[in-house]
């Protein structure tokens, strides 16, 4: 629940969770590909719009990565520093080694755990799309607007505002709620079944690194510095590529776009 309400709070405050956007934009990208396939032009120009769209998506994700890493690192560092000032003890003095080891791709199953988080990002995108489609089909906003009790209690104008807000925000709220449930319960399920299951998301990893460094008083061998940096980059890339790849694959299947078109898309992105 802590994860779920945390993600909902991020969403409602207008902030962005890194790697969440790609799974939500795959349908738009698939539409762009479909339109490109219909163009009567040179082969190398068919997917120029996709390449530009993908480049914008990648740039926005890079900014989200940097923003999430800086914010999570700073907040985590501030919390452990504040805890030491308040209680007079370093609360991560005995756990810093595990926190940093978990961020290393050669000392832990970081890649697998990052891929699991990517799958959950993909599923949360599916949930958001499904809720949005159901709302449109069931005329969700109209039903809220015409609810007699709400109209009497809030008035017509406020009820319409509430309906519009719920229609816009509800898919994201439910999506983030379930994303939090998936992320927060994975390690517990793994422990119950005696499986090495866990999640790694770039935001959490950067926070763990901050706490681990504070616990170690920032005294690490140079190789560990390198590996935790490499691990952070790998986690972000795996989160992105798994969630985006799965979402794009589903979107392609729904529009009957052949798998052979992927090579043409890669070439277009490379040229761009």
Annotated model-derived regions:
Residues 32-59, 99, 151-168:
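Short membrane-interface loop/juxtamembrane segments of multi-pass integral membrane proteins
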Residues 1-4, 84-119:
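Long, highly hydrophobic alpha-helical transmembrane signal-anchor segments
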Residues 1-41, 60-84, 120:
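Core alpha-helical transmembrane segments of integral membrane proteins
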Residues 20-32, 90-94, 137-144, 199-205:
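Interhelical loop segments of eukaryotic multi-pass membrane proteins
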Residues 1, 56-78, 111-114, 168-189, ...:
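Transmembrane alpha-helical segments and their cytosolic interface motifs
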Residues 1-24, 115-135, 182-188, 236-249:
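Hydrophobic alpha-helical membrane-embedded segments
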Residues 77-93, 192-202:
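Membrane-helix interface motif
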Residues 136-272:
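Long, compositionally biased intrinsically disordered regions
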